[in-house]
Amino acid sequence: MKIQPLGDRLVVKVAEVAAEKTKSGLYVPDTAKEKPQEGEVLAVGPGAFNDKGERMPMDVAVGDKIIFSKYGGTEIKIDGEEYLVMSQRDILAKIN
């Protein structure tokens, strides 16, 4: 993947959700499931500028596992794969 986010944005590969099955054996369709809120950072922008014109460093790096806001980010598709492009402010926590 060749994509470089700008400013304080990053590209995230959303964690796969395992197929859910009810107690009676029925599979739950993707449209009925909660949106996943975990993923892996694949690309990071250079950071936003503060009021003094200085670039602020990003709090995450490529390879970090994160938890992000439920409705954070914009879905994109590259080479048949789905990703999210989001602002750093949409990140809630890093997973260690």
UniProtKB/Swiss-Prot annotation:
User: GO terms for biological process?
Assistant: chaperone cofactor-dependent protein refolding
Q: Which UniProt keywords apply?
A: Chaperone, Cytoplasm
Q: Does the keyword Cytoplasm apply?
A: yes
Entry annotated with the keyword Zinc = no
Gene3D superfamilies attached to this UniProt entry: GroES chaperonin (2.30.33.40)
Q: Record's Pfam families?
A: Cpn10
InterPro entries membership: Chaperonin_GroES, Chaperonin_GroES_sf, GroES-like_sf
Cell location:
Cytoplasm
> May I have one GO cellular component term?
cytoplasm
Gene Ontology MF terms in the entry: ATP binding; metal ion binding; protein folding chaperone; protein-folding chaperone binding; unfolded protein binding
Its main localization is cytoplasm
- Give the PANTHER family listed for this entry: 10 KDA HEAT SHOCK PROTEIN (PTHR10772), CO-CHAPERONIN GROES (PTHR10772:SF58)
Function, in words: Together with the chaperonin GroEL, plays an essential role in assisting protein folding. The GroEL-GroES system forms a nano-cage that allows encapsulation of the non-native substrate proteins and provides a physical environment optimized to promote and accelerate protein folding. GroES binds to the apical surface of the GroEL ring, thereby capping the opening of the GroEL channel.
Assembly and partners are described as: Heptamer of 7 subunits arranged in a ring. Interacts with the chaperonin GroEL.
Q: Its family?
A: Belongs to the GroES chaperonin family.
Tell me what this protein is called.
Co-chaperonin GroES
Organism (species) = Syntrophomonas wolfei subsp. wolfei (strain DSM 2245B / Goettingen)
